[in-house]
Curated annotation (Swiss-Prot):
Transmembrane segments: none annotated. Its EC number is 2.7.7.56. Keywords: Nucleotidyltransferase, RNA-binding, rRNA processing, Transferase, tRNA processing, tRNA-binding. Belongs to the RNase PH family. One of its GO terms (molecular function) is tRNA binding. InterPro entries: ExoRNase_PH_dom1, ExoRNase_PH_dom2, ExoRNase_PH_dom2_sf, PNPase/RNase_PH_dom_sf, Ribosomal_Su5_D2-typ_SF, RNase_PH, RNase_PH_bac-type, RNase_PH_CS. Phosphate binds at residues 93, 131-133. Homohexameric ring arranged as a trimer of dimers. The gene is rph. GO terms for biological process: rRNA catabolic process; rRNA processing; tRNA processing. Gene3D superfamilies: GHMP Kinase, N-terminal domain. This is Ribonuclease PH. PROSITE patterns: RIBONUCLEASE_PH (PS01277). It comes from Corynebacterium efficiens (strain DSM 44549 / YS-314 / AJ 12310 / JCM 11189 / NBRC 100395). Phosphorolytic 3'-5' exoribonuclease that plays an important role in tRNA 3'-end maturation. Removes nucleotide residues following the 3'-CCA terminus of tRNAs; can also add nucleotides to the ends of RNA molecules by using nucleoside diphosphates as substrates, but this may not be physiologically important. Probably plays a role in initiation of 16S rRNA degradation (leading to ribosome degradation) during starvation.
């Protein structure tokens, strides 16, 4: 169990306070949906591209599909990382985050209303300062909404596939205190690290939580989930404001 000591965040935020969040739509012009999302100094480009047809396992189902890929640019971190494509092997962490983004965004789309079309989500980290996967999920929803709007305008989709927003945020225990939206310097020293994905209605899509340095109690888990819920509500508000809804 974590002991409680005094902890003050380096950036001066309250424990349950998000970093400044900025969502810029139309960041690039080629994809149907393109967004730059910023959580403080973390910056992720999220795009949504439309591909006619579906994977083999979805053919003749009448349903669409959504897939996602995640990557970090070499200079996204303080020390340059070699491109995984050049190394000839995609890291397990990259696969895990790609799958997480895909699962999360599939909770925000009714595949039965998409027709046999595929939406490919690409999330590229331009600058990493903690919370890259949660920023990616949050920004990708806005890109997804724009892509579906294009599909509807073109008469490609038979129904209204977009579901209410899905957002994600990190939370952790630092010196026994729950903190929301961890930057890198907090993430590396956190006793417990969690990522929480939620719908607008407050339902959980996914919870990833690990006692990095110690165990944690049910009460501490509840505290972390409470501030994560607060953060996700604020992020949904930011998503809807960006989309003008």
């Amino acid at each position: 169990m974590t002991s409680t000591t005094s902890f003050t965040r380096a950036d001066g935020r309250a424990q349950d306070q998000m970093r400044t969040v900025k969502i810029t739509r139309g960041f690039t012009t080629n994809p149907a949906g393109s967004v730059l999302i910023e959580f403080g100094n973390t910056r992720v480009m999220c795009t949504a591209s439309v591909e006619l047809g579906v994977p083999r396992f979805k053919r003749d189902s009448g349903e669409g599909w959504l897939t996602a890929e995640y990557a970090m640019l070499p200079a996204a971190t303080a020390e340059r990382n070699r491109r995984e494509s050049m190394a000839g092997k995609v890291k397990g962490r990259t696969h895990e985050i790609s799958r997480l983004i895909g699962r999360s965004l599939r909770a925000a789309v009714d595949l039965s209303q998409l027709g046999e079309n595929t939406i490919a989500i690409d999330c590229d980290v331009l600058q990493a300062d903690g919370g890259t996967r949660t920023a990616a999920i949050t920004g990708a929803y806005v890109a997804l909404a724009d892509a579906i709007r294009v599909l509807k305008e073109q008469g490609v989709v038979p129904g209204d596939p977009l579901l209410p927003p899905v957002a994600a945020v990190s939370v952790g225990l630092i010196d026994g205190q729950p903190c929301l939206d961890l930057p890198y310097e907090e993430d590396v020293r956190a006793d417990v690290d969690m990522n929480v994905v939620m719908t607008e209605s407050g339902e959980f899509v996914e919870i990833q939580g690990t006692g990095e340095e110690t165990t944690f109690t049910r009460a501490q888990l509840n505290e972390m989930l409470d501030i994560a819920e607060k953060g996700c509500r604020e992020l949904v508000h930011a998503q809807k404001a960006a989309l003008g809804i």
